[in-house]
């Protein structure tokens, strides 16, 4: 190893006394200090493991409550629901998910391929503009399109004035329907598919696509048989996110009077007053979520085609004439329908009509929104840092399992979270109130139910995945040697 006999002898003696050599240089270490540091390191790992486990329990409360409801006694309300309206909930939810999956696939994959593989006027602007509809809540877009496309709206009024027809004499699609809800939700959620599939086209499909084109394949054949299969995991991942958000949607389907799981849960709880039946309905809904998670995890498995197609950049084809104009139009339509029309309509109403009472309550609205947003963000980031550092220090299977369970909340629909959290929190509040009333004659009231704390709790469970992925990506960019250097100082 390039050391002299004298240095080799000193190195052998150092193995006993605690002196360590590396490349002939002398580093003094204390064996006792190393032993103590190892013991402290084991204790630290146990602390991080326990912390990650407690966080997973904290975030899994809604799931635990819902799963335990399956073993609760059956009520008359649940018997009525399971025999009468449950098939309708299942059918409408599946039909809504199928339509949304179809629409978002067509819009997302089509625009992703055009912006990734072709060159046309406005491509650079449309590449980021196609993400804008994701910023609009689906129920707000539903309000706007209902106002525009309803019988008394400007669109049908213009049709009647131009044609002279009356109600019932012409066909116009009903916006407040299941198909209308699928259309609205698709306009808002297609960017999930667009973003993931576009990256897959650029990074994974380039080599195989160029090879197919070199061997004489037509552009459509190379896209359909080569590029699209290589991007299948990204497409399935995007669709899984879209369908989870579709399951979670309540405002759109409730406003359009479409009976789905989300509307059924709240209707069972608040209209029928049966929490147990609502929890059982949420458990059925949770089975859909689990199925989507399993499908998404299964399609993450790497394939040979994906491994081959990782290198290279996709060469864009220059479009000209009517083809280029058509590509521009196809990419402009989702932006106009999903972002510009809703945003422009709301801005027009705000400027022309407005609300005279807005100034009195607007400050309070902003304050409440900022309070909840900042509190949830701070709590989620702190918890995410704990999970990230636990993974960094230990990287054990137990910690990784705790992290996977803790970040499951992003797949939980809002209705499921509401039912799964409200039931145990309300029971806890009643138990505390009863204890203080009986023991100290103090009326505490409800400490958590109906407060900002429970809302923040729900948001943390829902969006901890986003916070963890961001912090973990940043932490992985920091070499572990920095941690060791800091501890040595």
Where are these regions (language model features)?
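C-terminal structured domain segments across diverse proteins
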Residues: 343, 358-489
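Interhelical loop and adjacent transmembrane-helix boundary motif
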Residues: 44, 176, 250-290, 320-324, ...
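Glycine/proline-centered hinge or cleavage motifs at structural transition points of membrane proteins
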Residues: 215-216, 229, 489
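Transmembrane alpha-helices
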Residues: 53, 102, 132, 136, ...
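Transmembrane-helix boundary motif in ABC transporter permease subunits
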Residues: 99-130, 143, 147, 197, ...
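Short membrane-interfacial helix/loop motifs at transmembrane-helix boundaries
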Residues: 42-45, 49-88, 93-98, 152-153, ...
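C-terminal transmembrane helix and the adjacent membrane-cytosol boundary/short C-terminal tail
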Residues: 27-30, 34, 42-48, 55, ...
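Membrane-interfacial helix termini and adjacent extracytoplasmic/periplasmic loops
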Residues: 35-38, 75-79, 83-87, 122-125, ...
């Amino acid at each position: 190893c390039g050391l002299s006999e004298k240095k080799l002898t000193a190195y052998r003696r150092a193995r006993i006394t605690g002196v360590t050599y590396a490349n002939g240089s002398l580093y003094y270490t204390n064996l006792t200090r190393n032993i103590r540091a190892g013991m402290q390191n084991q204790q630290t790992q146990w602390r991080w493991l326990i912390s990650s486990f407690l966080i997973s329990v904290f975030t899994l409360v809604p799931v635990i409550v819902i799963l335990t409801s399956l073993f609760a006694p059956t009520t008359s309300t649940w018997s009525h629901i399971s025999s009468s309206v449950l098939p309708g909930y299942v059918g409408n939810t599946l039909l809504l998910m199928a339509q949304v999956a179809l629409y978002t696939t067509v819009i997302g994959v089509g625009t992703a391929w055009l912006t990734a593989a072709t060159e046309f006027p406005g491509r650079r602007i449309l590449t980021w503009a196609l993400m804008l509809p994701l910023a609009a809540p689906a129920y707000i877009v539903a309000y706007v399109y209902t106002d525009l496309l309803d019988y008394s709206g400007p669109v049908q009024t213009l049709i009647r004035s131009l044609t002279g027809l009356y109600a019932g004499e012409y066909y116009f699609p009903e916006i407040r329907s299941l198909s209308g809800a699928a259309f609205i939700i698709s306009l808002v959620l297609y960017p999930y598919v667009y973003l993931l599939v576009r990256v897959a086209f650029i990074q994974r499909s380039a080599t195989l696509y160029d090879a197919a084109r070199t061997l004489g394949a037509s552009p459509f054949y190379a896209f359909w048989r080569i590029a699209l299969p290589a991007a299948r995991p990204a497409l399935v991942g995007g669709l899984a996110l879209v369908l989870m958000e579709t399951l979670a949607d309540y405002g759109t389907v409730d406003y359009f009077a479409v009976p789905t799981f989300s509307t059924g849960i709240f209707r069972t709880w608040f209209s029928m007053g049966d929490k147990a039946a609502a929890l059982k309905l949420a458990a059925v809904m949770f089975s859909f979520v689990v199925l989507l998670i399993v499908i998404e995890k299964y399609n993450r498995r790497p394939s040979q085609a994906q491994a081959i197609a990782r290198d290279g950049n996709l060469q864009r084809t220059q479009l000209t004439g009517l083809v280029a104009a058509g590509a521009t139009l196809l990419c402009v339509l989702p932006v106009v329908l999903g972002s510009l029309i809703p945003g422009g309509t709301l801005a027009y109403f705000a400027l022309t009509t407005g609300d005279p009472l807005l100034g009195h309550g607007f400050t309070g609205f902003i304050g409440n929104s900022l309070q909840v947003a900042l509190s949830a963000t701070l709590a989620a980031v702190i918890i995410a840092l704990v999970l990230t550092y636990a993974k960094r220090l230990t990287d054990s299977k137990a910690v990784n399992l705790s992290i996977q369970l803790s970040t499951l909340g992003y797949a939980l629909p809002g209705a499921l979270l509401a039912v799964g959290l409200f039931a145990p929190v309300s029971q806890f509040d009643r138990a505390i109130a009863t204890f203080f009333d009986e023991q100290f004659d103090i009326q505490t009231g409800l400490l958590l139910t109906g407060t900002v704390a429970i809302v923040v709790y729900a948001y943390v469970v829902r969006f901890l995945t986003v916070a963890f992925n961001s912090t973990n990506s940043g932490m992985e960019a920091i070499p572990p040697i920095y941690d060791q250097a800091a501890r040595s100082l």
